[in-house]
Amino acid sequence: MSLNAVNHRRVLHRMPELDDELPDTTAYVRKVLEPLGAEVFSPIKGGVCAYFDAGAEETVALRADMDALPVTECTGLFFASERPGRMHACGHDGHTAIELGLAEETARMIRAGEKLPRNVLFVFQPAEETTGGAGRICETGVFEKYRVTRIFGLHLWPNLPEGSVWSRPGPMMARSNEVTLKVTGRSVHVSRAAEGLDALRAGVDWMNAAYAWTEALPPDVLRTLQFGRMTAGTVRNAVAGSAEIQGTLRTYDEDAAEMIRSHLRTLAAETAERTGCGLEVSFRTGYPAVWN
């Protein structure tokens, strides 16, 4: 199984696709699954499922994500991405390859007459990095139809020793909130800076205040707030008339997330009053935290 999984991963790594636009990826997944004797179907755009009926009352589901990231690969690997601006940089090619190998092994066991304690539903999910393909699959009722009582997923983690698996009860992975601050000021030439409203400086002030406040929270409020992108202004010798800061907030529970979101809004209002700029902070909530 391991050799097949390695081969699957290298094929998939060469042809990364984004979001739920996965025609080549799903074609390859179906090509592997369809000869195995499973019921293969597409629950949503860009998704594939394979159901192995072992004659059991209950079904266990195994899930893998398939989409890549808008990143240019520079690894020099012989199986590197052949698509500029797209790369399997988060390991979803590995997740899909592992699940394909497990599907092949499940088919072998059934053909050999081995008794499985449960039926098996393999779920290949699109849009994990973007719009939430998992939720759309859940909404189709597929898990109720096939009597799924438990579902397992995994994520490759290079920091772990090779050959090891890590899990624990309780929180495993934090929930994500995308944070965006938009600042509106007034652009003037730097020789008349006093007549302008500096959107860049207002954005930086807000960001520094946000960092200072979250870093001072008690250690039992598990959180990460990090800003990774900032754009502002048009030229070096003019006060920036607009600015935008983008970041990520991660927490394990919704109460902590809402407390931090509320304070970031308060900081935006205070910064607007102090600077005269308009500040609008918005959030896009991602997946909930993983709890076992």
Give the positions of each predicted feature:
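Acidic/His- and Gly-rich active-site-bordering loop/insert found
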Residues: 1-88, 93, 97, 104-118
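Structural signal for hydrophobic packing residues in well-ordered secondary-structure cores
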Residues: 2, 9, 13-16, 33-37, ...
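General structural feature for long, well-ordered alpha-helical segments within catalytic domains
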Residues: 4-8, 21-32, 58, 86, ...
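Conserved short loop/turn motifs at secondary-structure junctions
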Residues: 18, 124-127, 285-289
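Histidine/acidic-residue-rich, glycine-tolerant segments that coordinate divalent metal ions
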Residues: 47, 69-71, 77-87, 94, ...
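Metal-dependent amide/peptide-bond hydrolase catalytic core
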Residues: 201-292
